[in-house]
Amino acid sequence: MAGYPKIIHTEEGMRDGLQIEDRDIPVAAKIRLLNALSLTGLQEINVGSFVSPKYTPQMACVDELISGFEPQPGVKYTYTALNDKGVERAKAYSPPLSPRVSELSTRVDMCDAFAQRNTNRTQAQQIAVWPKTIARAVEKGVKEGGMSISNVWGSNWIGQVPFEQHMLMFDRMYRMWEDAGIPVTKVGMADATGWNMPHEVERTLVGLKERYPTIKDFNLHLHNARGVALASIYAALKVLDGSDTLRLQTSIGGMAGCPYCGMGRAAMMIATEDLMHMLQEMGIHTGVDLYKLIECVWLAEEVVGHQLFGFTSKAGPRPHYDKLYAMDMPHIETLEQAKHFILGKKAYEGAHSPWNEPITSWQRPEAPGYKEKLAKQGEKPESIPGVQPKLVAR
């Protein structure tokens, strides 16, 4: 089937992002950020983790956060819990939190060292749980199974994981589900240490689709430590098609990280605004107001006290129609001045302007005789830069 896969996106700024930031950020500031995110058109937001503050002190206020924010209709609010105790805590806040869907999946980390650092279990202990997971699925009459691998392509402790090695691990899980009479329909790939590369992600997805035709649901949790995660998502969009579902997690401004991966905040995620900009420019509907989302990034920078890592929040989206730049605007040199795409002229007030006369051009849609001149050249207006259909209205 042609076309792009169905995309299900989860915003991780409140969870993966804030878990690596200052533990003393006031809860009121977090509530303000969550309220703003809720008004951007994002379909799903992870609000935080129900975990021990001993291990993740940044999440100590998650109960107060959920009690204090203003949920919006149409937004799915999710959470992270690593054990039954966390799940039970979260039940007290449903709604607004969406009930957790009970899905049984076999999981393993390709890096034994990271498994111990992150989950306090060895890889062998993770594998030993598989038969119990599948037996529970059989007992419950589950019709579909899932499998997931972390550090699929490598880690900072063992280096690169060859394609054949992680595919063999997928195959071991798949065969166990198959022997139990349960087809695997979902697969997850996590990359906490940022080892993804577009050509390797492509090869893995092609391999999965060729070997396991029952799988139609793919989850990619990619970190952007080496700056190529967005390209890896693009590779996934080209491999998968309209019969598939692609689940993605990103974070506003790219803020994210893991204290156990050895890189801290440098293990950032794809910036949500960069992903949404790319999808919209590819003609993929997101429902997100990109300008409101960028204002959330600026707010997040105030909350955490430092500049974040995305690009679209600094340069702005590719401008169309009424968003085209003023041709005689002055010299723009700083990041603050570049915010004129939202703030207008006040962003560059007082900047140096060398132009003696106003700059005009026939190539602007507002120019007299613009359409007629295009027609003489045999071109259609929508084929010229600056006159493409606007994808998101402000």
Q: Which role does the model predict for each range below?
A:
Residues M1-R394:
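Catalytic cores and adjacent flexible loops of soluble metabolic enzymes
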